[in-house]
A protein has these predicted regions:
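Short beta->alpha hinge that forms the Motif I/post-I loop of the SAM-binding pocket
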Residues: 33-34, 67, 92-94
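Rossmann-like NAD(P)(H) cofactor-binding subdomain of soluble oxidoreductases
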Residues: 75-127
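NAD(P)+-binding Rossmann beta1-loop-alpha1 motif at the extreme N-terminus of oxidoreductases
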Residues: 1-58
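Internal alpha-helical scaffold of NAD(P)-dependent oxidoreductase catalytic cores
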Residues: 133-219
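Interdomain hinge/lid region at the active-site interface
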Residues: 203-272
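Residues at the starts of beta-strands that form the adenosine-phosphate
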Residues: 2, 27, 111, 138, ...
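Rossmann-like NAD(P)-binding element
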Residues: 53-90
């Protein structure tokens, strides 16, 4: 199976690496606007070759779009226009609603399978690609009834090869859930980093006092602004709703602190501890489905 990966950063590079090593693809062709990324991907063995998009699409069985959401809006319609009827197309973007609306009336819409592998790190570029990044994680497939069966099966086969468990929902549902479980955590990390940088003018003090808790909480602030700004833009309504809920909890905590209601704070912390049970059940489910 000739597989095209458009965008050779962390996610695209990791997909290319695993599909190549697991022999899911007979050939993995990379496409990237940045020539340095293309060269790095070749040098690292992530892809078999790097070409332009039009050339890559010749005889392609599967196209994986792994580029920033701002570029996705432009490139997905172009790929649908140029791809043969046999080519299956998926994207791995973090938002789905706006993209789904963009191509809903395209004559080749049924060749497209919107998806989102819920995996990643704060790093970017081909050198950030990781073997086994997706194993045991969840891939969300959206609006499956709008995709032709054989194209859906091809994308499902890809995620099987990546050892991911698959769940299905609408694009609208995806964007609401992603705002809470993914986008909000990145915003929290970005804002925490800015708060500390504003208040702690002496970088040495941050270095000396920061412990593991700070490092783990602020880790996502190292994520690419070029990737995340378009995500927030395209999912603005759901993200704003998530922020309203989050800020409400912050204000509730601040009020209890100001009024010295320590029992109320302890109750809030105990309730937050319930996330341990939720996360454990998620881990257990992943083990069962592997």
């Amino acid at each position: 199976m000739k597989t095209i990966v458009v965008g050779l950063g962390l996610i695209g590079g990791s997909i290319a690496l695993d599909l190549k090593e697991k022999k899911f693809a007979t050939e993995v062709v990379g496409v990237d606007l940045r020539s340095d990324h293309g060269k790095q991907a070749l040098d690292l063995g992530l892809v078999d070759q790097v070409t332009g998009l039009t050339q890559a699409l010749q005889g392609a069985d599967l196209v994986v779009l792994a580029i920033p959401m701002s570029a996705m809006n432009r490139l997905l319609p172009q790929i649908l226009n140029e791809a043969s009827e046999n080519t299956s197309i998926t994207d791995v973007g973090s938002t789905k609603g706006k993209l789904a609306q963009l191509v809903q009336d395209h004559p080749k819409r049924r060749q497209y399978v919107p998806s989102h592998p819920m995996a990643g790190t704060e790093n970017s570029g081909p050198q950030a690609a990781l073997r086994g990044l997706f194993a045991g994680k969840t891939a969300v497939i959206c609006d499956k009834d709008q995709s032709a069966g054989h194209h859906l099966k091809r994308v499902e086969a890809m995620y099987d090869a990546l050892e991911m468990r698959m769940i299905y929902m609408s694009s609208t549902e995806h964007d609401i859930h992603a705002a809470f479980v993914s986008h909000l955590s990145h915003i929290s990390s970005f804002v925490l980093a800015n708060t500390v940088l504003d208040m702690e003018k002496n970088v040495a003090t941050i270095f000396d006092l920061a412990g593991g808790g700070f490092e783990s909480t602020v880790r996502l602030a190292k994520s690419s602004p070029e990737m995340w700004t378009p995500i927030f833009e395209q999912n603005a309504d759901s993200v704003e709703h998530a922020l309203d809920a989050y800020i409400g909890h912050l204000k509730e905590f601040q009020s209890a602190l100001r009024e010295k209601k320590w029992d109320k704070i302890q109750t809030q912390l105990k309730r937050a501890n319930e996330i341990r049970r939720v996360l454990q059940s998620i881990d257990d489910k992943k083990k069962v489905t592997r």
